Each structure stands twice: as C-alpha cells, then as structure tokens.
UniProtKB/Swiss-Prot annotation:
GO MF terms held by the record: ATP binding; histidine-tRNA ligase activity
Domain of life: Bacteria
EC numbers: 6.1.1.21
SUPFAM superfamilies: Class II aaRS ABD-related (SSF52954), Class II aaRS and biotin synthetases (SSF55681)
Protein name: Histidine--tRNA ligase
InterPro entries in the cross-refs: aa-tRNA-synth_II, aa-tRNA-synth_II/BPL/LPL, Anticodon-bd, Anticodon-bd_dom_sf, His-tRNA-ligase, HisRS-like_core, HisRS/HisZ
Length: 422
C-alpha cells in the first residue's frame, strides 16, 4: 500500500467543498477589481527562479529541481511571481503602455520541514499589477489583500508594513547595515553569518538574532530613505489610514525575496492565545522585469497562503454554514427496468440547471430509501411500478414530508415554480 508523500495531503468531502467555496469567493472578489486570471506552468526552467531571487534561501535550499532527459534543469515553482513576470516579458506585455492587472491561483512546492499550516505542496493565491508605480496603487493593492482576508470573516488581522526605498536607498542602506554588523559578526548565528555575505537584510528575519540588543540598535532603513522615497511611503501610510486598514509600521520587515523595493508588507493573524501567524505578504518590485530582459516596468503584488487561511477558517462560520452543496432531487428507481427512464428525468433536470442524482443499485425499498436520504436531497422523486405505468413521478419534500404525484412531463415546470429551488 502506498501513502502520500510527507508534507502533502488529500482534499475531499467537506474540506474540498470548503476550499471550493473560498476559491469561488476570492475569484468573485477579484473580478470586482477588474483583475484578469493568469495561469503559468507549474514547471519552469530553474533560471526563472534564480533570476528572480538569486540570493534567496528559497532558491538555494528549498526548491524541487531536477534534470530532464536533455539535461535541462527544471524547477517546480516555489512561488507565483517569477512565472508571471516571465510570461509578461515573453508575451511582450512590457512593451505596451497598458496597466496589466493579474491574479493567479495554484499549487507551489518547497522542500522544507512540514509543520502546522506549512507543507511541501501548498497553494498560493496572488495578485500582480504591472506597468505603474505610485503610492495610490500601493494603497489599493495592500487594501485588497486586507479586504480579501477580512471578507472571509477573519477580522483580527494586522498589516505590518515597511519601505525598502528606491534602488539608491537600498544600496546605500546595505552598506550602512553591513558596516554596522561587521563589529558584531561573531555574535551572529551561523545562518546569519552566511546571510551577511549573500543576503544581509534577511538577518532581520532571524528568530535567533532578532532579539539580540545589537540588532535592536541597528540602523533602520526608514531613517536612510531618500526624500522622494520617504514622501512616497508617508503617502502610503496616510492612504491606508483613509481606507481603514489596521496597520503597524515594522522597521525590521524586509520580506524573504530580494527583488522588493518601496512598500513591503505582511498580513498577520492574531489568535486568541496571543500568537501571530503570517497569512501572506507582498510589495513593490520596480526592477524585476528588467532582470528578465524586459523594458523597465514597475509592479506590485502579494500572495496569500491558502493552507494558513483554511486552517483558520476551519473554526469560522464561513465554512460551517451550508457546507455541503445542496442536492435538488434524488430519483429513487425501484427496479433495473425503470433505470433509463429515471436517468432521462435526471438528465432533463440537469439541463434545466437543477442538481439531480439517482441510484444504481436496486435493494429493498426501505434500504434504497435510507441510502437516498443520506444524500440529503431537497426532494425525493420515486419511480415505482405505478408511476412507471402511468408516466408519473411521486415527489416528496424531505423537509415538510409532503408529497404529490405528477406527470413526468411536468417535473421541470414543478421545479421551476418551486420557491425553494430558485
């Protein structure tokens, strides 16, 4: 017997229905923001992710990469942005003056230690808006990420936000930060000593070093923003206030990928025990398109982790109300000889927009009835010898227990005129 791979899981029954409900809710919300869905391959050449985050630990340590039969290195996507940017450039959208607003949804893969809310195959839903850069767009995108989560009934959330400034700010600060940490190099943990050489800002993320006094006293990037970048960031903060977004300025927030500029943010959930869980995050990336060989084209985006969202929603009313999709009609066929007449009825109802099912085994009436009612149909349609001989069907309301017998040709009009089904 085979078992599922560590860090993966199966979705079925109630959980699957809840996932679909959340997915459909998010798609409907994104459509209201005039976002267009984009679907990129699950597999890309390794260089796509190397280009997007060459110093990231995600690329160096966590990706599933393999050589194909022609010795080309292929990577299962660990995140959604890089594939969208590759597609944007490959399809020459960077050469248009149009603002492109995308959303994506699908599985991603990272080889990391499985834990609660974190898997080796996981799902991201994300937004990427390409072609413009200004504080107003930052505000709407951050507010959208915030609204997406709140609209699911998860209200105790906070946006943590920082600015990495423009390229000039970023490069200047890297040198200031490095010079400061040089004197504390021996106090860094082994991982942060490695980060010191390759991706120094990730030291801010370290759980071991983050509480050390020397890091708490380190220079803050906010204090080194050039004037234009500071004005822009203050406009973003003011905009978030006007949009009633609950946010917190977080000077040590840098995000895990090294292509970000200007506004970066994470959305955290504050549970009843006082613990926080990161549900998603994102930021601006003014220079990412040029790294892929495209024309300068700034962008901003975010991604939310579906598994984290679903683990919280499991205890919320969003997934507990009407969790199972309703079945309008179950046609109970008493004997095999009547099956195709029952199937024809089910097909007719389906063509008219009603959900219908029927039995494929023919047990005693009491056993068949018991199995039919387990499907929780709104109406039970009984096709027995009497009904068959007279081209009739007996319809029973499973809630009120009232029943009536009508001609089979009138079934559709009966359902169309029934308020419970419309």
């Amino acid at each position: 017997m085979f078992s599922k791979i560590k860090g993966t899981y199966d979705l079925m029954s109630d959980k699957m229905v809840c996932w679909q409900k959340v997915e459909n809710h998010i798609r409907t919300l994104f459509a209201k923001y005039h976002l267009q869905e984009i679907r990129t391959p699950i597999i890309e050449y390794r260089g796509v992710f190397d280009r997007a985050a060459q110093h990231s630990e995600m690329v160096s340590k966590e990706t599933y990469t393999f050589a194909d039969k022609k010795e080309r290195f292929i990577t299962l996507r660990p995140e959604g942005t890089a594939g969208v940017i590759r597609s944007y450039v490959e399809n020459k959208l960077d050469k248009t003056s149009q603002l492109h607003k995308f959303f994506y949804y699908g599985p991603c893969f990272r080889y990391e230690r499985p834990q609660k809310g974190r898997y080796r195959q996981f799902h991201q839903v994300g937004v990427e808006i390409l072609g413009q850069s200004n504080p107003f767009l930052d505000v709407e995108v951050i507010a959208l990420a915030y609204e997406t989560i709140k609209s699911l009934g998860i209200c105790d959330i906070t946006v943590k936000i920082n600015s990495l400034g423009c390229k000039t700010t970023y490069n200047n600060y890297l040198q200031v930060f490095k010079n400061y940490l040089q004197a504390h190099y021996q106090q860094l943990c082994p991982l942060c000593q490695e980060r010191f050489e390759k991706n120094i800002l990730r030291i801010w993320d370290c759980k071991n070093c983050n509480n050390e006094p020397f890091l708490k006293q380190a220079p803050r990037i906010f204090d080194h923003l050039v004037e234009d970048a500071k004005v822009r960031f203050l406009q973003v903060l003011e905009g978030l206030k006007q949009m009633n977004v609950n946010f917190e300025l977080c000077h040590d927030l840098v995000r895990g990928l090294d292509y970000y500029t200007h506004s970066v943010f994470e959305i955290v959930y504050n549970n009843e025990q006082g613990h926080q869980a990161v549900l998603g995050g994102g930021g601006c990336y003014d220079n990412l398109v040029t790294l892929f060989g495209g024309n300068p084209s700034p962008g901003i985006g975010f991604a939310l982790g579906m598994e984290r969202l679903m683990s919280i929603l499991a205890t919320h009313s969003f997934c507990n109300k009407n969790i199972l999709p309703s079945l309008d009609a179950f046609i109970l066929v008493s004997v095999p000889q009547f099956f195709y007449q029952g199937l024809a009825l089910a097909t007719t109802l389906r063509h008219q927009g009603f959900s219908a099912d029927l039995n494929y085994q023919f047990l005693s009436f009491s056993k068949s009835l018991k199995q039919a009612l387990k499907q929780q149909p709104l109406y039970l349609l009984i096709l027995g010898p009497k009904e068959f001989d007279n081209n009739q069907i007996t319809i029973k309301n499973t809630d009120t227990q009232q029943q009536t017998t009508i001609l089979q040709k009138d079934v559709v009009s009966y359902f169309q005129n029934n308020k419970e089904l419309n």
